[in-house]
Amino acid sequence: MKTIYQNITLLASFLLLFTSCGCEDEKIEKQPVNYTVLLDLSDRILVPQQLDKDFALIETTFKSFEKQARQNLVISSKDRFSIKIIPQKNSPLNVNHYEDLLQLYLDETEVAIKNKSLVSLSKTLPKILENLKKEALYGSTSNTYFGVDIWAYLHDNGMGLSKSGYENKIIILTDGYFDFESQAHVIQDKNQYTSTRFLNDLTTSNWKLISESQQYGLLPIQLDKNTKWIVAGISGKKSTDILQTEKITYFWEKWLKQSGVKRIGIILNSSKTDMSSKLSEQL
């Protein structure tokens, strides 16, 4: 009888331990998500419908953020959403104004107004983007727009875009070029540069073999290894080079990997619907 009692006690202990472990697993909280969209407003936006595509991707990202925030109670959400406009020389655009309007950090928002703030940005987002489009299109020719320094921006701010304790997702809306008006602005270390001008030297079908043997590429920087980076809108500028999109994709992936990134997504420039669908799958 004593043995039976001991066996029952032992079995009950195992069941209690198993149940406790299950409860602990359920208590493990999923990390909040930090969504950041980087916007390149260089002369690429003169391409018809380009900003419409960019803004569709921004709205897709916001919907993912909103869904994430509402998975549990909004009042307990710590998720973050923001748009960062890459600085551009001589641009009359009030960057700080739009960045303030296009961000919502629920971890820094008072509990009482979290839901109101989320609903408000959801309603006003299309209008804000419409106004941004009007002000961003301040010129009609490429000469009016200076190139944006993506390399310098990410060199200075890349690590700061990722927040500790979060699942970080950074989306860069760009054609993929690191172009400037003057080569004097470019830093070079052997065959690694801070611009993509070296693409002009890789014009043959064996460009990849040449780039690997001579170590062509972009100068690596330091980026958070756990952050997911998505580059959306990559597009070739030269109709005479049918391999240009492939080259840009190759060097972006190479650069991000050399900079420490493990998770990379690439979305080529296509229709608004197609790009939005692909982004939604990767978020």
Walk through the language-model features, giving the residues of each.
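Sec-dependent bacterial lipoprotein signal peptides
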Residues: M1-C21
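Bacterial signal peptide processing site
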Residues: G22-E26
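Von Willebrand factor
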Residues: Q31-L104, E108-G165, K169-I171
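Extracytoplasmic/secreted cell-surface and envelope-processing proteins
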Residues: I45-Q49, S91-N94, D179-Q183, K238-L243, ...
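Scaffold/interface architecture of coatomer-like assemblies
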Residues: I85, K114-S122, F180, I187-Q188, ...
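Flexible, glycine-rich surface segments
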Residues: F146-T227
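Von Willebrand factor type A / integrin I
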Residues: R197-L283
